[in-house]
Structure formats: structure tokens, C-alpha cells
Amino acid sequence: MVLDRPLAVGADGGHGVIRYYVSEYEPGRRVRFTFRPRTGIIGAHELSLDTLDDERTRIRHVLIGRARGAMRLMFSAVVAPLHDAVVEDLFDNAERETTGTVVRPATWSPRVRVLRRLTGGR
């Protein structure tokens, strides 16, 4: 994920052909990315942090949207598996950053490995 400026409402970015902009941002709590129309997804995805107690925080990722056009075919076959792998990597990175280790690291399926090679690693 690359943004054209520091994280703030209005920052534009994405990864590969998936494009979005920051539509809502609460520093340290929540960020919502709304998909650009040309992406073929009408909707948004959001990351949020919920403090559970002094020792635990829940990281939540929610994807709300509807695919249209060619994305209807691409989503299940290509986008969803790559997206899930990226989110799992993000959660692993957050765990590593906060605890110094990852108890159960995510692994990429053979399908994700092939798709990453075909899409240039995005």
C-alpha cells in the first residue's frame, strides 16, 4: 500500500490496479479507504484498533463492497486470495512490531505464490 502523502483524509493511493483514497481517519484508532470507481469495486475497506485491556488490542479489517464489471470475475479468482494474504501479512507485521515475534506466522498458499509471481509481487 502506497499513499501519495502522509496518512490523512484525502491521501490517494493503493497497490497495483487497486486504487483508493483515505475517506475517514481517526489517528491511532481507525482509517477507512474508499475504492476509486475505476477499480471495479464500489465500497471501502477499513482498519481499526480496539483496546481490550492494558495488554491487548484487537486489530480489525473490514471490507465492504460490491464488485462490478470485469472485477466480478477477477475478485474471487485473483483479488480475494491476494488481498487475504496482504491482510495476514499486515497482522503479522503488527504482531512483530508490538511483541517482537509472531506466534503463528501466516503462510502463502501455492495459489497466492503463483498469483504474486503473475502480478509482479503486488
What are these language model-derived features?
Residues 1-44, 93-108, 120-121:
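Glycine-rich portal/gate segments that line the openings of hydrophobic small-molecule binding cavities
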Residues 37-89, 105-107:
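Beta-strand/loop substructures that line and gate deep hydrophobic ligand-binding cavities in soluble
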Residues 112-122:
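Short terminal or interdomain "cap/linker" segment that borders an active site or interface and mediates
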